[in-house]
């Protein structure tokens, strides 16, 4: 009741007609953790460990308002506005967008649900079946810097349709308008897929693609992915994921395979040197071509010479008691670079979650990332790449949801 009253006050402050809603609720989550990460690049060949207070590692910190109105005849109007933030600094998330996590309005009924606005696509639902569901942001970087979208990316200017539940199956399709005058395809995004849940079995399959444009309908990590090369309307990202999980008593075993294709990045490369882990600091006067190639973002996921990547994700969630779960997972990512050897990343994660109550939980995670023939994406929250072929991070945190 207190939440509903507070939500009405918030909406009134924005001048909204809160009184028209059948129900309005404020909700959110706050996730803070202490972290230590070793072998972070501090310049040149130097490295150092980092102690930090992180936000949203396992569950993105957020504050949202949602409402539903019964229109009669089995039809309901609904809306959600959700803001992301960093609890360690108080800064807004999603590059400062006010309702960066979600802003939608729509209708639901026997026909399914239609939502319009800024929202995630079905690959977020598919990803939640495996490691992203257990570890959250812990595994987003090894998942091709989340270019496979399994840890949640948003689509601006979008309309999404979700089917009713048919004996455990729910389908979804999303379309993002590029809003480019004279070129409908520029900046356009499209995705579809579905999930199936029946007893101990859970399966998901999703596909998403985005096109280059002055405005990109989709949030895409990696500046090179949909920026430069080709022309407006050219497809710059294609990705799909297949995931499955099965509950064996107290143990949930899961796995997924993701593939990302970046058609435009390869088109921009005319020369590709062999990978050299010391090229970035071998010649500070930039007298060698390798240094120039590194500066342009080669040998990184979504970089100038990265044309595709694929990720295998395997894990187990073992429930020891109603309050305690042990979680573990492994990710193997292989990145294909133009006219040179493939890069590889392997990340191992071990952790535990303990529920103090229905709304409050604690967690501890240790993870190790190893790379070869490419630059490390790093484990640190501020995204400073690891400077070594092996990097370890430790986190202990607290989550409160309301």
Write out the residue ranges for each language-model feature.
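Residues that define the transmembrane beta-barrel architecture of outer-membrane proteins
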Residues: 4, 47-61, 98-101, 153-157, ...
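Outer-membrane beta-barrel "beta-signal"
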Residues: 354-356, 388-402
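Detector for outer-membrane/organellar transmembrane beta-barrel domains
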Residues: 193-349
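Gram-negative bacterial Sec-dependent N-terminal signal peptides
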Residues: 1-21
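Outer membrane beta-barrel
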Residues: 22-36, 51-180, 186-188, 195-205, ...
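Outer-membrane beta-barrel architecture
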Residues: 9, 64-66, 104-106, 160-162, ...
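Outer-envelope beta-barrel architecture signal
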Residues: 4, 22-28, 69, 73-77, ...
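Sequence/structural signature of outer-membrane beta-barrel proteins
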Residues: 35-41, 86-90, 123, 176-182, ...
């Amino acid at each position: 009741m207190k939440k509903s009253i507070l939500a009405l006050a918030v909406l009134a402050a924005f001048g909204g007609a809160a009184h028209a809603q059948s129900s309005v609720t404020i909700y959110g989550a706050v996730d803070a953790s202490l972290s230590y990460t070793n072998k972070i690049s501090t310049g040149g060949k130097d490295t150092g460990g980092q102690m930090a207070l992180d936000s949203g590692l396992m569950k993105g910190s957020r504050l949202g308002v949602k409402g539903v109105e019964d229109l009669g005849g089995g039809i309901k109007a609904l809306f959600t506005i959700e803001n992301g933030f960093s609890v360690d600094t108080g800064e807004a998330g999603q590059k400062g967008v006010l309702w960066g996590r979600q802003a939608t309005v729509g209708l639901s009924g026997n026909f399914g649900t239609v939502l319009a606005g800024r929202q995630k696509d079905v690959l977020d639902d598919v990803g939640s079946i495996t490691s992203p569901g257990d570890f959250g942001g812990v595994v987003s970087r090894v998942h091709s810097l989340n270019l496979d979208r399994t840890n949640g990316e948003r689509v601006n200017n979008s309309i999404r349709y979700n089917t009713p539940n048919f004996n455990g199956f729910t389908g979804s399709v999303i379309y993002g308008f590029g809003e480019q005058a004279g070129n409908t395809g520029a900046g356009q995004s499209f995705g579809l897929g579905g999930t199936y849940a029946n007893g101990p079995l859970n399966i998901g399959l999703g596909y998403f693609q985005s096109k280059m444009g002055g405005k990109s309908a989709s949030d895409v990590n990696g500046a090179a992915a949909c920026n430069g090369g080709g022309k407006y309307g050219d497809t710059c990202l294609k990705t799909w994921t297949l995931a499955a999980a099965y509950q064996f008593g107290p143990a949930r075993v899961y796995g997924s395979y993701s593939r990302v294709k970046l058609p435009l990045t390869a088109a921009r490369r005319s020369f590709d040197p062999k990978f050299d882990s010391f090229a970035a600091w071998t010649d500070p006067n930039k007298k060698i071509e390798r240094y120039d190639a590194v500066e342009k973002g080669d040998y990184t996921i979504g970089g100038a010479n990265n044309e595709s990547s694929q990720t295998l994700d395997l894990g187990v969630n073992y429930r020891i008691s109603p309050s305690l779960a042990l979680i573990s997972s492994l990710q193997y990512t292989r990145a294909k670079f133009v006219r040179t050897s493939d890069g590889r990343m392997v990340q191992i994660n071990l952790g535990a979650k303990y529920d103090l109550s229905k709304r409050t939980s604690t967690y501890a995670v240790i993870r190790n990332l190893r790379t070869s023939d490419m630059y490390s994406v790093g484990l640190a929250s501020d995204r400073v790449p690891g400077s070594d072929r092996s990097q370890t991070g430790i986190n202990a945190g607290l989550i409160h949801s309301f």
